[in-house]
């Protein structure tokens, strides 16, 4: 129970290690991080009893940037035949669970195990329920079984309210055929990640206005239009005719980094390929000057020192807003649909309600 296991995007194991090591050092939890390149996972092995539990207790999962999912526990080797009996024996000292997720890594090997997990879950669930180890209670801890192979599994536990929203941190979003580009899924995932579902009507309402900077061909604009917003699309490139035909989109041929609205809007979204420091300046202007209430912006990552650069820019934003004496909530996550980038959500907390 003294290892913290984390899923991530393949190639970002080093960023997960850097991030969790920084938090562990700040909290005084001794241990070391390790992650095999392209394995889609990393671990923090605690050298003191209860270290992993303390890390998960002190940290909020939604404040971590690069981990997609986490659980504390340990590895179990399984026989070829009676895997369930071995797992039940291993779970004797665990609490009673309120939910069960079988997970695999986001790798070719992991995908090959998906069919096995689907078939294995039904008899395992029945056995856990019969043994009194699993009940239907969202308030209880979640049992997370990450299969590395058919013979090796990481048996982990996490709070259902302090872990990923979806198994492996991967949302099951369907690409809308009428959307102009697949980038639309990034913004849809961001809504789920950063805004509680019960607040969507209030914060993503059809009486709102939005701006999409660098909008062409309209993947992110599509999400705003889908919510019924009036959208100003800023880009020198063309917009999809299907979006223009809705009557909800005004397309202005302008530079997304210099154009500003005459009146404040509810939402600004931006997915421009640019150096992250320049995009950060754009965020500071829009939120700092009250040009929008909320924003979702992608920061493109450098080739090296990716976590360090993201941390530096987030700290810079926080210091800038503090110096201006304005209250802004800042969240950042590498979403499943992100590639060499992270997605930031910002919200002014000191503006009068609409």
Swiss-Prot record:
Keywords: Cytoplasm, Methyltransferase, rRNA processing, S-adenosyl-L-methionine, Transferase. One of its GO terms (molecular function) is S-adenosylmethionine-dependent methyltransferase activity. It is found in: Cytoplasm. It is an enzyme of class 2 (transferase). The keyword Cytoplasm applies. Its EC number is 2.1.1.186. The active site is at 300 (proton acceptor). InterPro entries: RlmM_FDX, RlmM_THUMP-like, RNA_MeTrfase_FtsJ_dom, rRNA_MeTrfase_M, SAM-dependent_MTases_sf. It comes from the Bacteria. S-adenosyl-L-methionine binds at residues 183, 216-219, 235, 255, 271. GO terms for biological process: methylation; rRNA processing. It catalyses: cytidine(2498) in 23S rRNA + S-adenosyl-L-methionine = 2'-O-methylcytidine(2498) in 23S rRNA + S-adenosyl-L-homocysteine + H(+). GO terms for cellular component: cytoplasm. Catalyzes the 2'-O-methylation at nucleotide C2498 in 23S rRNA. Belongs to the class I-like SAM-binding methyltransferase superfamily. RNA methyltransferase RlmE family. RlmM subfamily. Monomer. HAMAP family: 23SrRNA_methyltr_M. PANTHER family: RIBOSOMAL RNA LARGE SUBUNIT METHYLTRANSFERASE M (PTHR37524), RIBOSOMAL RNA METHYLTRANSFERASE FTSJ DOMAIN-CONTAINING PROTEIN (PTHR37524:SF2). This is Ribosomal RNA large subunit methyltransferase M. It comes from Pseudomonas putida (strain ATCC 700007 / DSM 6899 / JCM 31910 / BCRC 17059 / LMG 24140 / F1).
């Amino acid at each position: 129970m003294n290892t913290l296991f984390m899923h991530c995007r393949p190639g970002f194991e080093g960023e997960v290690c850097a991030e969790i090591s920084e938090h562990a050092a700040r909290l005084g939890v001794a241990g070391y991080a390790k992650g095999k390149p392209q394995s889609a996972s990393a671990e923090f092995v605690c050298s003191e009893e209860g270290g992993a539990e303390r890390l998960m207790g002190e940290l909020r999962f939604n404040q971590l940037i690069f981990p997609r999912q986490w659980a504390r526990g340990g590895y179990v080797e399984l026989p070829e035949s009676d895997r369930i009996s071995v797992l039940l024996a291993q779970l004797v000292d665990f609490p009673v669970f309120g939910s069960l997720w079988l997970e695999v890594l986001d790798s070719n090997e992991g995908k090959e195990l998906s069919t096995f997990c689907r078939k294995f879950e039904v008899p395992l669930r029945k056995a856990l329920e019969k043994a009194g180890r699993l009940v239907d209670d969202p308030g209880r801890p979640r049992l997370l079984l990450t299969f590395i192979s058919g013979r090796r599994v990481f048996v982990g536990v996490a709070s259902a309210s302090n872990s990923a929203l979806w198994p492996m941190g991967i949302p099951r979003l369907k690409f809308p055929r009428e959307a102009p580009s697949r980038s639309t899924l990034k913004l849809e995932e961001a809504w789920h990640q950063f805004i509680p579902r019960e607040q969507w009507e209030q914060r993503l309402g059809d009486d709102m206005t939005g701006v999409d900077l660098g909008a062409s061909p309209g993947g992110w604009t599509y999400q705003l239009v889908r919510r019924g917003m009036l959208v100003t699309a800023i880009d020198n490139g063309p917009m999809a005719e299907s979006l223009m035909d809705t009557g909800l989109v005004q397309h202005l041929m302008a530079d997304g980094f210099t154009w500003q609205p005459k009146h404040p809007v509810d939402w600004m979204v931006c997915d421009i390929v640019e150096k992250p420091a320049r995009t950060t300046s754009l965020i500071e202007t829009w939120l700092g000057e009250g040009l929008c209430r909320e924003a979702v912006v992608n920061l493109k990552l450098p080739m090296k020192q990716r976590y360090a650069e993201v941390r530096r820019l987030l700290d810079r934003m926080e210091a800038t807003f503090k110096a201006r004496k304005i209250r802004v909530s800042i969240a950042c996550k590498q979403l499943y649909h992100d590639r060499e980038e992270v997605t930031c959500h910002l919200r002014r907390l000191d503006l009068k309600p609409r």
